[in-house]
């Protein structure tokens, strides 16, 4: 479940407004509070779609900043390739967000703006474009979409062939 959470949070790129090329290629100002996001390792997930899927990071230049009020903002560029490991069918997605995380005890409220990759065994794997609000319980692992506006692509259906 931790791998799923790590990729969901990473999917906060969440998430698609990429930084301008100049700012994305520059190192963050050490006084800005921005910290580079470390991608999780590429991994195969067997409990999301009716077939195993491999999620690979193609490009990452994301940064996280936690503000004084505790809200964490993730911005930058994130591109992943998702592959149906049975058929070899794959698709590349820009899921550059941005995203916002607010924590209250064990409950994390995630706001995804732009494009995001969200997945859970309950609803499958989705790439969203628009605003999505979700909650994640860090103790139980429950991930729930509270509201969404915009386009949604069912990645499992896309890769089913």
Language-model features: locations:
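Bacterial N-terminal signal peptides that target proteins for export
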Residues: 1-10
């Amino acid at each position: 479940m931790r791998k799923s959470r790590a990729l969901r949070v990473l999917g906060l790129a969440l998430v698609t407004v990429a930084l301008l090329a100049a700012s994305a290629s520059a190192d963050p100002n050490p006084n800005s509070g921005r910290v580079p996001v470390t991608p999780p390792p590429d991994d195969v997930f067997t409990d999301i779609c009716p077939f195993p899927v491999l999620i690979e990071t193609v490009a990452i230049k994301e940064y996280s900043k936690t503000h004084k009020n505790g809200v964490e903002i993730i911005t930058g560029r994130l591109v992943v390739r998702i592959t149906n490991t049975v058929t070899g069918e794959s698709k590349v997605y820009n899921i550059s967000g941005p995203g916002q995380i607010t924590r209250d005890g064990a409950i994390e409220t995630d706001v995804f703006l732009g494009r995001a990759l969200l997945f859970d065994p309950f609803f499958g794997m989705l790439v969203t474009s628009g605003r999505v609000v979700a909650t994640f319980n860090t103790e139980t692992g429950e991930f729930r979409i509270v509201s969404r506006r915009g386009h949604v692509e069912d990645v499992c259906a896309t890769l089913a062939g």
